[in-house]
Design a protein with these regions (language model features):
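Catalytic cores of alpha/beta
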Residues: 140-151, 189-198, 239-256, 327-337, ...
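An N-cap/entry alpha-helix motif that binds or orients negatively charged groups
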Residues: 2-85
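C-terminal helical cap(s) of enzyme catalytic domains, especially alpha/beta-barrels
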Residues: 217, 222-226, 262-303, 307, ...
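Catalytic beta/alpha-barrel core
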Residues: 105-114, 132-141, 154-165, 180-189, ...
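Glycine-rich phosphate-binding active-site loops on the catalytic face of alpha/beta enzymes
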Residues: 147, 151-167, 204-214, 253-272, ...
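Glycine/Thr-rich beta-alpha phosphate-binding loop at enzyme active sites
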Residues: 76-88, 93-115, 187, 194-224, ...
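Alpha/beta enzyme core
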Residues: 86-105, 127-128, 142-155, 171-182, ...
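Conserved, mostly hydrophobic/aromatic
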Residues: 12, 72, 97, 148, ...
Length: 570
């Protein structure tokens, strides 16, 4: 397994180019002179209408996006995870996927780093001639596409980071001449700018950075929002099960490419396919949806990621959430001062918001989040760690929580149980459900004893707040499948509003796990030092800006934003 600091992509490309020069485009494999297998389309044409990023308020119609490719990968090892299944029989793995409903496969043919070969591709296509097969490799020359075609590939992967624009253009032209689909893979804005003039019709966005091998599930929706042409989108990496597939579909992606998690757990294929179906509305139309009917803004995570990207291009400040708002005047002041998210508590608290407030501020462009707590007695409790954490969660959640950090797993492996909506009686407050469905709220922050299997059953989009007493709770936070998890300081009496700050060592550990969201105990006096030390992705404040409970002090709010701007000036 290679350390994440190494630029593995450059090493793979250099070593492969040397082998290519010696062995040629077949890498020594014996191929048929003519293709015998039928060409199977990888994806239907992109739907007409708005492009993926045609404005943040573009209509979202997931039912029209169904039938995108769901690709399941066949590989023996990887640079990030080492050996997965060294003695793997590629055909047998494809058979496992096929039994679960898969009809498209991604076959790694790179030998040195992934343990694959063209023989694997040939064998899989011979066994499943009616299924679509993608050749996944670090292709470098147009003549490699003819080799792929003869070997039986129906599609090829073109990695934008590995190719010059003129090479991508030549390979797209060659693929079209052969009848092959070309999945053009992006990782960042530089890749997007490189391929934009070419307008590829099938685009994969990888949540795993090939240079560091870290995963960030917000990368694909952020890049998708910037695509200006009509195309089909495939979410690559970070898909561990049902909820991840549902997230991808709700984020506007037409399909997924699933790697290590499917390799290790091929029984996950049906739930991943079901997650896509539910996101597209197919299962709901048939009366079989597994998720709550309470849906807010499906583009919430994409819009949040786009805001993050915009901030990183200028003054690289964190996202700012102002929580515990109870008046329109405070909400408007927060928006005027530059807040990215506004938080509203819907639980017993001196900061409880009224539904009428959301009506009054419907014109504000900030993302709006409800802070809620499902009744612990109605939430499922799976495992002693969950019960232990659930017992700690108080009954008075507050946006002014003590300290939170986002802990984002850096792998698409998920050994946990399916997190579909099967938890029974837990329900979202009716007023919050109505506000979500009317578009007056964008998302929900669950702040109670909700377990990983509860959250998606209650509402979407959501993220979870977990109260942390020690490092074990940081591990618990990673069990939730939302792209970010808020981590709150533990208090035996209240779930929030205490003004306490989390142990600095726990904050440091959380920051090392992934993008850090930090809140609670934040004030204009300490925010500059905190941002400078921990570089959080998001800071969340409530009581630290108050003159009285539920009422913001305008001077404190303005000074808070100024302190953040000062420390982040570049």
């Amino acid at each position: 397994m290679i350390g994440t600091e190494a630029n593995v992509l450059d090493r793979i490309l250099a070593e492969r180019a040397a082998r290519l020069k010696v062995a040629g485009a077949t890498f020594g494999s014996r191929l048929p002179s003519l293709r015998s297998a039928p060409l199977v389309p990888l994806a239907s044409p992109a739907p007409s209408g708005v492009a993926p990023g045609a404005g943040e308020h573009a209509p979202f119609q997931p039912a029209a996006q169904a039938h995108g490719p769901a690709l399941f990968e066949i590989k023996r090892r990887s640079p990030s995870r080492g050996v997965i299944a060294e003695g793997l029989n590629a055909v047998e793995q494809a058979e496992r996927y096929h039994r679960g409903g898969a009809r498209a496969f991604s076959v790694l043919t790179e030998s040195e780093w992934f343990g694959g070969s063209l023989e694997d591709l040939i064998a899989v296509k011979e066994r499943f001639p009616d299924c679509a097969v993608l050749r996944k490799d670090f292709l470098q020359l147009p003549e490699e596409l003819e080799v792929s075609f003869r070997a039986g590939a129906d599609a090829v992967l073109l990695i934008a980071a590995a190719l010059a624009r003129e090479d991508i253009a030549a390979m797209l032209e060659q693929a079209a001449a052969l009848g092959l689909a070309a999945l053009v893979e992006l990782h960042d804005r530089a890749d997007l700018e490189k391929v934009a003039p070419l307008k590829p019709t099938l685009v994969g966005i990888n949540s795993r950075d090939l240079r560091s091998f870290k995963v960030d599930k917000l990368t694909p929706p952020a890049l998708a929002a910037e695509i200006s042409w009509n195309c089909r989108l495939v979410f690559e990496s970070g898909i561990g099960g049902y909820e991840d597939a549902y997230f991808a579909g709700c984020s506007g992606f037409h399909g997924v490419l699933v790697g290590e998690s499917a390799m290790r757990n091929p029984e996950r294929v049906p739930e991943i396919l079901a997650g896509l179906e539910d996101a597209y509305g197919v299962a709901r139309a048939r009366g079989r949806s597994r998720v709550s009917a309470c849906r807010g803004n499906p583009r919430f995570w994409g819009e949040l990621a786009s805001r993050r990207a915009a901030l990183q291009m200028g003054r690289a400040r964190p996202l700012v959430k102002i929580c515990g708002l109870t008046t329109a005047a405070d909400a408007r002041l927060a928006a005027e001062c530059g807040a990215d998210l506004l938080g509203f508590v819907f639980a017993e608290s001196p900061r409880r918001a009224e539904a009428a407030l959301l009506e009054e501020i419907a014109d504000l462009r900030c993302l709006k989040v409800a802070v809620v707590q499902a009744d612990d007695a109605r939430c499922s409790h799976q495992g002693s760690a969950h019960r232990r954490s659930g017992a700690r969660h108080g009954r008075h959640p507050d946006g002014s929580t003590d300290a939170r950090a986002a802990a984002s797993p850096d792998t698409d492996t998920d050994t946990r149980a399916d997190t579909r909506a099967d938890t029974g009686r837990a329900e979202l407050q009716p007023e919050v459900a109505r506000l979500l469905e009317r578009g007056l709220l964008d998302a929900v922050q669950f702040h109670g004893g909700e377990q990983p299997a509860d959250c998606l059953a209650l509402a979407y989009p959501y993220y979870k707040a977990v109260r942390v007493r020690d490092a074990r709770d940081l591990e618990l936070a990673c069990e939730y499948r939302s792209p970010r998890v808020l981590i709150d300081a533990f208090d035996p009496e209240r779930a929030g509003g205490t003004g306490k700050r989390i142990n600095p060592e726990l904050v440091r550990q959380a920051a090392e796990r992934g993008a850090l969201w930090l809140a609670g105990g934040l004030t204009p006096e300490n925010i500059g030092a905190i941002v400078a030390e921990y570089r959080p992705e998001l800071v969340d404040v409530s009581s630290g800006l108050e003159g009285a409970a539920g009422r913001k002090d305008p001077d404190k709010l303005k000074r808070y934003m100024e302190e953040i701007a000062d420390v982040c000036t570049v």
